A protein has these predicted regions:
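N-terminal pre-domain/capping segments
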Residues: 1-88, 310-339, 344
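Acidic/histidine-rich catalytic cores of soluble enzymes
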Residues: 136-220
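C-terminal accessory extensions appended to soluble enzyme cores
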Residues: 267-365
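Active-site acidic/histidine proton-transfer and metal-coordination neighborhood
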Residues: 79-174
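Conserved, mostly hydrophobic/aromatic
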Residues: 32, 98, 143, 178, ...
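Active-site-proximal loop/turn and secondary-structure-junction residues that shape catalytic pockets
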Residues: 12-14, 36-40, 59, 67-69, ...
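Acidic (Asp/Glu)-rich catalytic clusters
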Residues: 21-28, 45-63, 80-96, 133-138, ...
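Gly/Pro-rich active-site loop or hairpin
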Residues: 44, 75-76, 115-125, 185-249, ...
């Protein structure tokens, strides 16, 4: 098996482009990941179009969606239009695969939404599989899902690997293993990163994401809450586990470093970002790659039904939960709410408050 390619999640901001220019000039960026739907409503700058086309023509472009919302309980015109635009995008450029986030964004202003987790349940699994069928049918490419950083409870953390494994089974899909997302869960629920990583089907990992984040003070306990804000350096704890993770992921093809485009402004920040890139490069070069059973991603026939799978009761709960969080309802009030799908009685009060802060920041209504 070849060593995985090292690349970046491309950002259009001038600060980001200035920071990565030395890497582009030295041909160090072996693959680009592009969140294609952030420009669905705008025209790409000419320089960006040319850069993406260059990587596309060399089979080194991968796509990462943000706004599909895999687990919305109702199928909407917005999702239908999203898939139509994605079809146009994959006709325009050659992508090696397309990925999306785990979770749902049940808001009126989806462009300012944030994905929230869903519990493992036969109905949520059925909805997720239906949305993945439609995604793969639209692009006729391998399709993958990224693990989510945010969790309301340790139960969410423990079941996500199993959920994702079941979710991708019918389409021969793959996983993005985001190690900073796992780092957030490890910090917030006081477990070891390795213990969470072991819960994932590592043979299904085709791509790894690396990034940094930030801390916020806990209101309910004497600890700090880790947030996946993509605005800082890769934590040392992630560097510590990365060699082992690379060795365990027998079908790994890509390692992508993520950083928000407006967060690398000073020369010191640029140098530190480049140092992170160089350090990851060294780890990949020094890693011991094991050859596993080669998987042909996305080769199964999809079980696409004529009508999208929907569930009115789940939709009501998603809408009610989002509004409770947006309205800053008390944690105890939310924990006492009667839900069928969401087990709010098990939720951590700090995580409820964190979700409220995120949703208020993005103002989905």
């Amino acid at each position: 098996m070849k060593k995985p390619l090292l690349g970046l999640s491309m950002m259009p901001e001038a600060d980001f482009v200035s920071a990565i220019l030395p890497l582009l000039q030295s041909n160090s960026v072996e693959v680009l990941e592009w969140s294609f739907d952030i420009f669905y409503e705008a025209k790409e700058p000419e320089w960006l179009d040319e850069l993406l086309n260059f990587y596309s023509e060399n089979q080194r472009l991968i796509g990462h969606g943000v706004y599909y919302s895999l687990f919305d309980a109702l199928w909407t015109e917005r999702q239908e239009n999203w898939l139509k635009k994605l079809k146009e995008e994959v006709r325009k450029r050659k992508y090696s695969h397309i990925t999306e986030h785990f979770g749902f964004m049940n808001t009126e202003n989806f462009h300012q939404g944030v994905p929230l987790p869903v519990p493992l349940h036969p109905k949520t699994l059925l909805i997720g599989k239906d949305r993945l069928y439609r995604l793969q049918d639209a692009v006729e490419l391998p399709v993958g899902i990224e693990n989510l950083a945010f969790s309301f409870s340790i139960e969410d953390v423990k079941e996500q690997g199993v959920f994702l494994d079941n979710l991708i089974a019918d389409i021969n899909g793959f996983l993005i293993l985001d190690l900073h997302n796992i780092y957030c869960q490890a910090c917030n629920f006081e477990v070891e990163m390795e213990d969470i990583i072991r819960l994932y089907p590592l043979d299904k990992v085709r791509e790894i994401h690396l990034s940094g984040g930030s801390w916020q003070e806990s209101v309910y306990a004497r600890k700090m809450i880790r947030r996946d804000t993509h605005d800082n350096l890769i934590p040392e704890e992630i560097f510590s586990v990365l060699p082992s993770v690379i060795t365990q992921c027998n079908n790994l093809e890509y390692v992508i470093i993520e950083r928000l485009g407006h967060t690398i402004k000073t020369d010191q920040e640029k140098r530190a970002f480049l140092d992170d890139f160089t350090r990851v490069r060294r780890i990949i070069d020094d890693s011991e790659i094991k050859t596993g059973k080669k998987i042909r991603w996305g080769q199964k026939e999809t079980g696409l039904s004529n009508s999208p799978v929907e569930d009115d009761a789940l939709h009501e709960e998603q809408s009610r939960l989002t509004k409770l969080l947006f309205n800053s309802s008390g944690a105890e009030m939310i924990k006492e709410q009667r839900f069928h799908y969401f087990k709010t009685e098990n939720w951590d009060p700090d995580m409820i408050l964190t979700a409220q802060n995120i949703i208020k920041k993005w103002n989905p209504y």
